[in-house]
Design a protein with these regions (language model features):
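A short, active-site helix/loop in glycosyltransferases that binds the activated sugar's phosphate group
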Residues: 89-111, 121
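Conserved NTP-donor binding/palm subdomain of two-metal-ion nucleotidyltransferases/polymerases, i.e.
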Residues: 135-256
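Short N-terminal targeting/anchoring amphipathic segment
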Residues: 37-53, 67-73, 183
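Short glycine-rich, flexible loops that bind phosphorylated cofactors or substrates
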Residues: 51-53, 77-78, 101
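N-terminal pre-catalytic "stem/leader" segment of glycosyltransferase-like enzymes
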Residues: 1-43
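Membrane-proximal helix-turn-helix segments that form the acceptor-binding/catalytic region
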Residues: 75-91
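C-terminal alpha-helical cap of glycosyltransferases
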Residues: 119, 123-145
Length: 256
């Protein structure tokens, strides 16, 4: 899992949880299967104040479909109702139950997780804290992915087609479209789609009709060109003609 840590701290202020970010970012990779990155994250952890700037930053990621964990750098100190109502992370991380209770009071539907900062309590230690964060990141990411796949499956069901191959190919294309939106296209997604296209039998006209119904025909033509240049698909296995266009070139930039 690729995680990006963002600090929105400015000036010479020394908030309570300033060191927490650096502790997690510098040590989390030793606990689980985590890679700390600057680009193409699977999940983002934002440390900042309860402010409009923080809200805008988080919205930029959630709009792309990237889950966000938020930690208030000053705990309860900066919690103000006008600001809190603008914040919409996937999960609020709190260092104590009082902060969690206040967030739930202000935002009853918010998802909140309490993980104590080991610098300020004897009830935990660094290793335990890091494991809790690793578990939190995995849970947030996995639940987000499950939600994405559920939405994709619901879209594919609207086709009302019994052909498994068409349903599977459409599902993979829709997930690739989602990966493109979040600017994180893994090579294995391309190779898996190439394999599925090569090894599946389907009616090409029905496939093209499915693309039209899902409004992904244009995207599919761009993907065919991408699979030809960056994977192992050849023209004979394409259900729709390839188009090496602007979208193809943009997708190439986000392959990891």
């Amino acid at each position: 899992m690729r995680i990006k840590f963002i600090s929105l701290l400015k000036g010479t202020a020394y908030p309570l949880n300033k060191e927490l970010l650096y502790t997690i970012a510098n040590n989390i990779s030793s606990i689980g299967d985590v890679e700390v990155v600057d680009n193409a994250p699977d999940l983002v952890h934002v440390f900042g104040k309860w402010s409009g700037t923080t809200a805008t930053t988080m919205k930029g990621y959630t709009h792309k479909g990237i889950p966000v964990v938020f930690t208030s750098t000053n705990g309860l100190v900066d919690v103000l109702p006008p600001h809190s109502l603008m914040l919409a992370p996937t999960v609020f991380h709190c260092c104590g139950p009082a902060e969690a209770e206040l967030i739930k009071k202000l935002l009853p539907k918010a998802s909140v997780k309490v993980i104590a900062n080991e610098q300020f309590t004897l009830t935990t230690d660094r290793t335990t804290m890091l494991r809790q964060f690793n578990d939190l990141y995995a849970k947030v990411y996995n639940e987000h992915e499950a939600k994405v796949m559920s939405e994709i499956n619901n879209k594919v069901r609207t086709l009302n087609i019994s052909d498994h191959a068409i349903n599977e190919i459409c599902s993979q294309l829709l997930y690739l479209q989602y990966a493109f939106r979040r600017e994180t296209i893994r090579q294995r997604l391309l190779d898996n789609l190439s394999d599925t296209l090569i090894n599946s039998n389907y009616d090409e006209e029905s496939m093209r009709q499915a693309f039209d119904t899902l409004k992904i025909s244009s995207f599919a033509t761009s993907v065919m060109a991408l699979l030809e240049s960056k994977s192992h698909l050849t023209e004979g296995f394409m259900p729709i003609a390839a188009s090496d266009d602007k979208t193809t070139k943009q997708m190439q930039k986000h392959i990891i």
